[in-house]
């Protein structure tokens, strides 16, 4: 019996010493992202597409951020702010980059990135509409976009003005509301100052009224949860772009030149696009070379308002206002022949581009070339050297633009090689051409959208006809 108990004990001990294998679940593999999905809205300062590619302040920054992260950029445009919010909450997009202002309501829902630029919130009305003296007199007459920062502003104002009411549009964007103002369909709206400045080039009837909020930061929005890594990457990227001057460059590119506004000139330009441009457009396209033909056309308008017989007391003549020596240099015999003038002006402008230093980036070479076209390459080189002595970047248009007016002051031009120049006029000259160019691009895009709409309608009609033809005839 003792022997049997001993055997049983040994068996029990051996069993206890056996290795116990516990099956473990394999860790879930989460692949690294390959693309940055950015939610946005269409708008001239935010994101838009054209025959020249994608553009917009938010688009360019998103493109640079994706490159910084070594990811492929995917832009997703939504119909309204509400859809953007829903896409962020459902995880469809990584970031909202849509020109949205920093507000307490947005901070409650999302994480807010660093400021890209600042805007004023302004009341907008149509020329001829009574000028409002205060917000209290506009009960029920203001229309704004649902979920916009303007709703927050009006809500704050309502606390001290309980009777204040307004209308909200969910399915329209800022540009559509401004178009409705210009058409007289609604009396008042609220817009960002940058949006108003940009759209007044196409809708000169727009007028700026009361400033309801000053210097509101425009920011990107990130998900409220699980976005620590992305936020730290965005902050690091923002500091790099700020130090390198990218933010300042984009501000100058999209906003600086549109601040000057001339109602009469804008109306005249829009009329000239209809009445004069069609006669010369094919010639601009033919001789533009590496230049966007619309920049060449904008330059010609700045020079002569597309008047082939234009003359100046200084001796410049024709559509492109060429001097006699320049005409000889580019092989033009008759400066008053509009087609020869366009050919000569294009050739001369292209030569200016070729002669610029390679250090000037492609995105800014045209502005340097136009300034050279206006006051001469030598004076532009003087301005570049002057910028460098002041610790500025001689290859950045925003910096050279700031010192060009100094060439009119003896204190500065006496130290330059080429002396006095009307640098302030060169700045105005380039800014005007940029505004004209932007207007031509906008009108081109509108025409393209109109043609696309017509094609879609025609396709739908053709499909309907085919469907009807395919149906069996009833006996």
From Swiss-Prot:
> What residues form the catalytic site here?
303
Query: What are its GO biological-process terms?
Result: cell wall macromolecule catabolic process; cell wall organization; peptidoglycan catabolic process
InterPro entries, A to Z: Lysozyme-like_dom_sf, MltF, Solute-binding_3/MltF_N, Transglycosylase_SLT_dom_1
Q: Name one GO cellular component term.
A: cell outer membrane
Bilayer topology: Peripheral membrane protein
Question: What's a Gene Ontology MF term here?
Answer: peptidoglycan lytic transglycosylase activity
One Pfam family hit: SBP_bac_3
Identify the stretch(es) annotated as Non-LT domain: 16-258
Q: Which PROSITE patterns match?
A: PROKAR_LIPOPROTEIN
The family note in this entry says: In the N-terminal section; belongs to the bacterial solute-binding protein 3 family.
HAMAP family found in the cross-reference section: MltF
Please give the name of this protein. Answer: Membrane-bound lytic murein transglycosylase F
Q: Which gene encodes it?
A: mltF
């Amino acid at each position: 019996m003792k022997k049997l108990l001993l055997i049983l004990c040994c068996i029990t001990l051996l069993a206890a010493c056996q290795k116990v294998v516990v099956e473990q679940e394999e860790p879930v593999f989460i692949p690294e992202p390959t693309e940055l999905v950015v939610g946005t809205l269409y708008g001239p300062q935010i994101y838009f597409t054209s025959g020249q590619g994608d553009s917009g302040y938010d688009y360019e920054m998103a493109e640079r951020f994706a490159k910084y992260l070594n990811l492929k950029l995917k832009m997703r445009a939504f119909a309204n702010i509400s859809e953007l919010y829903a896409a962020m909450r459902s995880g469809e997009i990584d970031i909202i980059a849509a020109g949205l202002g920093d507000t307490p309501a947005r901070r409650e829902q999302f994480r807010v990135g660093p400021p890209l630029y600042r805007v004023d919130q302004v009341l907008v009305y149509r020329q001829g509409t009574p000028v409002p003296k205060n917000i209290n007199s506009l009960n029920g007459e203001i229309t704004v976009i649902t979920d916009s920062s303007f709703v927050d502003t009006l809500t704050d104002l309502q606390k001290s003005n309980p009777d204040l009411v307004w209308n909200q549009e969910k399915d329209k964007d800022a540009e559509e509301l401004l178009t409705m103002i210009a058409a007289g369909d609604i009396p008042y709206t609220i817009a960002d100052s940058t949006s108003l400045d940009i759209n007044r080039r196409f809708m000169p009837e727009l007028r700026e009224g009361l400033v309801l909020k000053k210097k509101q930061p425009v920011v990107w929005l990130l998900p409220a949860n699980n976005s620590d890594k992305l936020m730290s990457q965005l902050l690091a990227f923002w500091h790099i772009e700020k130090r390198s001057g990218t933010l300042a460059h984009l501000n100058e590119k999209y906003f600086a030149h549109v601040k000057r506004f001339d109602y009469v000139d804008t109306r005249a330009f829009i009329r000239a696009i209809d009445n004069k441009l069609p006669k010369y457009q094919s010639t601009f396209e033919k001789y533009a070379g590496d230049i966007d033909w619309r920049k060449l056309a904008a330059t010609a308008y700045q020079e002569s308002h597309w008047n082939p017989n234009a003359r100046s007391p200084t001796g410049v003549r024709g559509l492109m206002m060429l001097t006699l020596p320049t005409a000889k240099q580019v092989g033009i015999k008759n400066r008053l022949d509009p087609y020869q003038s366009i050919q000569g002006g294009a050739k001369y402008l292209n030569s200016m581009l070729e002669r610029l230093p390679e250090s000037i980036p492609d995105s800014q070479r045209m502005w340097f070339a136009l300034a050279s076209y206006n006051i001469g390459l030598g004076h532009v080189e003087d301005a570049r050297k002057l910028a460098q002595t002041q610790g500025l970047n001689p290859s950045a248009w925003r910096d050279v633009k700031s010192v060009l007016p100094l060439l009119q002051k003896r204190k500065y031009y006496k130290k330059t090689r080429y002396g006095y120049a009307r640098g302030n006029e060169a700045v105005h000259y380039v800014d005007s051409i940029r505004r004209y160019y932007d207007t031509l691009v906008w009108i081109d895009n509108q025409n393209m959208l109109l043609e696309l709409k017509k094609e879609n309608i025609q396709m739908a009609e053709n499909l309907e006809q085919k469907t009807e033809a395919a149906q069996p005839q009833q006996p």
